[in-house]
Amino acid sequence: MVSKKNKIVAALLAFFFGGLGIHKFYLGRVGQGILYILFCWTGIPSIIAFIEFIIFLCGSEEGFDQKYNFYYFQQQSKA
């Protein structure tokens, strides 16, 4: 079963733990999360995560749901 991802939780994880890619693991993007961990020593993932933090906060709930909660709503429509 797929759980619904929360936009605010994703934004907070990106802000506080973004350099390690924790928000990517939360959103189900495991491959990207591993890349963040591999390159965390460069500081680049921290910069990208801060940009993603801003995008999460400024983006619409519908856009977030389309991108990260697609499978959740697909399962709900089948039930």
Swiss-Prot record:
- Give a yes or no for keyword Transport in this entry: no
The main location is membrane
Entry's transmembrane regions:
8-28, 37-57
- Please indicate which superkingdom the organism of origin belongs to: Bacteria
Entry keyword Membrane: yes
Question: Which parts form a coiled-coil structure per UniProt?
Answer: none
Locations listed in the record: Cell membrane
Q: Which UniProt keywords apply?
A: Cell membrane, Membrane, Transmembrane, Transmembrane helix
Every copy of the TM2 domain together lies at 3-54
Per the record, membrane topology reads: Multi-pass membrane protein
User: For this UniProt entry, what's an example GO CC term?
Assistant: plasma membrane
InterPro entries assigned: TM2
Q: What is this protein called?
A: Uncharacterized membrane protein YozV
The record lists the organism as Bacillus subtilis (strain 168)
Gene encoding this polypeptide? yozV
